[in-house]
Amino acid sequence: MKEFFRMLGELKYMIPVLRYKWPDPDSNASLAHTFQDSTEKFAERPFVYFENETWTYSQANKAANSFARYLVKNGVQHGDRVVLFMENRPYYVISLLALNKIGAIGVLINTSLTGDPLIHCINSSDSIKCIVGAERAKPLEDVLDQINISNKDDLLWVEDNKDYGLPVWATDLKSNLDFNDDENLEETNLVTSKDTACYIFTSGTTGVPKAAVLPNRKLIAAAVNITKAGYRINHEDCMYNCLPLYHSTGLMLGLCGAIHVGASSFIKRKFSASSFWTDAHKYNTTAFVYIGELCRYLDNQEPSEAEKNNPIKSMVGNGLRPDVWDSFKDRFDVDRIIEIYGASEGNALFMNLFNKNKTIGMTSADVALLEYDVAEDEILKNEDGYCKKISNHEPGLLAIEIGPNAVFNGYTDKDASEKKILRNVFKDGDAWFNTGDLIKTVDVGFAFGKEHYQFVDRVGDTFRWRSENVSTNEVGEILNGFTDVNMSNVYGVEVPGCEGRAGMAAFSLEDVKNFNWNAFSEHVENNLPKYARPLFIRIIQEMDTTGTFKLKKNELRDESFDLNKVNDIVYCLKPSSNSYELLDREWLDKINSCKAGY
């Protein structure tokens, strides 16, 4: 009965979400409007805490207005695309707000990218300017002669509090701003709900990074529902946000949610398990936007005085695995863990509205779990050629029907968007978004008859590591670009004690003894971000393919780097090294006992 009455109390928060109507496409519902509304109400309240800085809503709004006017005077118009390549800090937020105020599109670049992936993201976006933080100027400088933004006036450099000098090829942004010209802009009145707010790059299911299109209405809908039914915070709360703002979790579930209710945000460049609870007490962070990996790190820390009586009461995020959930919630006395599930490019959101355990919750969208053959990497169909639904609690491929209430914005690349759509699934003419994820239904007890779900795994050509989606095809192309590597087969493998899957690659060599591992290691380091670098390399005799020449991954994935199953030579990349070395049983034992440091 206790659970029944608790659930009745949840109803008052759930009903507004179920009744929520998306903003009219032509209405003035944008991130900029939401921010300006909160500024009017809470002008002198803290907006952002960062290192030794505190910005009020009023200060941030004035800075964003000055920046927006500079952009307009220098040719940036409604609908133009502008690259934002900077670590988490106040001027990242101000830059994003400035762009939104004039209807420009922020092209949010992963700060770990270098080389070809960085070139691709910039050039494929067709951006006219680039805002670069001083801390990321070096990787941008390395590719200047290969990107389509070359004019000094279009490369806007933003100083950091570290000792960086202004590059000769860039313009010092802050020294060119008129901070006296800081009133709200008329241009903001022309920004609508349907306008694109930003591009967030995702590897999707295959190939190079693709730009997912996020309109203002998607940011606002997420912010409204997450704060109402998720965090349940208001303007007196402070959110702990150490996730990268170029990702949808840190941006949509974190920053946008805080802005919607006028709350404060404590932002960090990067997560630190050792200082987490000290920071939480210092800034009285009552809410936390998370990914599961961070929770595992915190739970693996030795108990400390700082974690006791901590202020965090509610958390919203994704990827918290069942084996960590209970331990984390009990140890740190967190009242609400609101796990969500969704994709930047996707058309629906799952949310654990009822604060149940070990579930991504429910959704208002029309969804189906399709029978899927993992070994053959294909959807199973009936004799009529239509897909078959899972009829029990077994995992199935999650598909979400595309319709007026579940719009698929997709990517800027129309061909890539089409590849994510399943057609004629249950009847001729229907269309469903293929998430590429295996999901199952779970019994969570009394839930007003609402079906609840749990994430199981990713399928196909993508795996997730260090909270990043990694495309096996993209990594494979980089590896194949090295001399003596003819064809590599890349896949994700589980590492004990770690979230997601780490990269592993298999390839054959004509001359194993004379293969230049130092040069290969350097090639990997220079061309792949750290999260995408394969941690394990298996040297095989011959590449195994299907009848249609698709690389077979299933057996390789199952054998992983287990030396008891693998007769081939396996090399590994240790956490403190950038060079591959032979995997021996001593290091394998450390990995299996969760003492390797991955």
Task: Name these PLM-found stretches.
Residues 113-116, 120, 130, 342, ...:
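AMP-binding/adenylate-forming catalytic core of the ANL superfamily
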Residues 260, 282-290, 299-373, 407-408, ...:
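Gly/Ser/Thr-rich phosphate-binding loop
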Residues 220-238, 246-286:
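Conserved AMP-binding/adenylation subdomain of ANL enzymes
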Residues 157, 178-201, 208, 231-238:
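Conserved pre-ATP/AMP-binding loop-to-beta segment of ANL
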Residues 56-58, 190, 197-221:
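Conserved AMP-binding A3 loop
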Residues 1, 6, 73-74, 97, ...:
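Structural core segment of the AMP-binding/adenylate-forming
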Residues 489-496, 504-508, 517-598:
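Conserved C-terminal "lid"/linker of ANL adenylate-forming enzymes
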Residues 23-28, 33, 44-89, 93-97, ...:
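Conserved AMP-binding/adenylate-forming core of the ANL superfamily
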